[in-house]
Amino acid sequence: MLRTPKAASDPMTLTQQEMRELPLFRRLRHAVGKAVADFAMIREGDRIAVGVSGGKDSYTLLLLLEELRRRAPIDFQLVAVIIDSGYPGYRGDIVRDYVTSLGIPCHLETTTHYEIITEKRRPGSSYCSICARLKRGALYGLADSLGCNKLALGHHGDDFIETLLLNQFFVGSLKAMSANMLADNGRTTVIRPLVYASEEEIVDFMGQVGLPVVSCNCPVSDSTDLKRRRMKELLKELEQEIPHIRSSMLKALSNVHPRHLLDQQLQGL
């Protein structure tokens, strides 16, 4: 958690106009606008469910998409969706109240994910992977029930890079994330408009605007995902020697040469 949760009316929170005047907000808006254009993420008439947890990434995503919606020459709708997984102490109401204060339609879904994980998780199995699968399923279901054809998630550029490294180091797969992909259910298109934004920019932005950040209150959040944490550390170490490593690795994901890889299914492409 970045800071103690606070009400949306907290005087430290900037107004919408004050936020729009921030140079960093304009830079992030440009990054999201470029991603939306590059990957054809949003079209006329789209109804987009935006996953909002109350964390820095999802808040940033929602604010930037709302700004794009306000300025866009096409018509599309946003619906914020909040999943309360049942972790004791999670304050989904704070998130809902803030989103509602922005005039954005919002749906808070309460689930029993915490009970399911506690009862069903096998010893040694990943807590985070089970939680992620349950939450993803809930988001797809909500997008369907709310009439949304797209689901926007708050993964930023560093998430793409870290996922690439994790799959290479621990899975033996050349795989990261997609910025615009039809989900396995065949109905929901998942978009990730923060692909060109860095985690550092998002942290700085959140520090400037003072939003009511809320922790998910996962009981193992401080002790799990050690592999991803190591990837973050590795990137920081390499960045000392190669300052542009993050932008270079992100660029590599859109500059693939199949003939120079070993996957036989790619031969001839």
From Swiss-Prot:
Its EC number is 2.8.1.-. [4Fe-4S] cluster binds at residues 128, 131, 218. Binds 1 [4Fe-4S] cluster per subunit. The cluster is chelated by three Cys residues, the fourth Fe has a free coordination site that may bind a sulfur atom transferred from the persulfide of IscS. Its cofactor is Mg(2+); [4Fe-4S] cluster. It catalyses: cytidine(32) in tRNA + S-sulfanyl-L-cysteinyl-[cysteine desulfurase] + AH2 + ATP = 2-thiocytidine(32) in tRNA + L-cysteinyl-[cysteine desulfurase] + A + AMP + diphosphate + H(+). It holds the Pfam family ATP_bind_3. Coiled coil: none annotated. Catalyzes the ATP-dependent 2-thiolation of cytidine in position 32 of tRNA, to form 2-thiocytidine (s(2)C32). The sulfur atoms are provided by the cysteine/cysteine desulfurase (IscS) system. The thiolation reaction likely consists of two steps: a first activation step by ATP to form an adenylated intermediate of the target base of tRNA, and a second nucleophilic substitution step of the sulfur (S) atom supplied by the hydrosulfide attached to the Fe-S cluster. This is tRNA-cytidine(32) 2-sulfurtransferase.
